[in-house]
Amino acid sequence: MLECVEEINESKRFRAYFSDGTITKFGQTNPKKGTFIDHQNKELKKNYIKRHLKDLETNDYTRAGYLSLFLLWNKPTLKDSMNDFNRRLKYNDFNIKY
């Protein structure tokens, strides 16, 4: 992934750009309880991941489900999550612990 930027006046919260030209919009614009990068609540993180593990069945890391799980619900900051996501891309390692 080359870049992830916050959307302005859009239906989704972020936009991810990939080196192959793929652009994916993802994340609710105004989630009621926020995401892990907003609140760092480990119990909410665990519950989110359990509910959304099925999103990984596509094996397509450019899909919104992958991006939400690995960028918004993985590490405490978007920057840390992006670094982790890029490491996972490099090693094709998309196993997640919760």
Pin down the residues of each PLM region.
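Arg/Lys-rich, low-complexity, intrinsically disordered basic segments
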Residues: 1-98
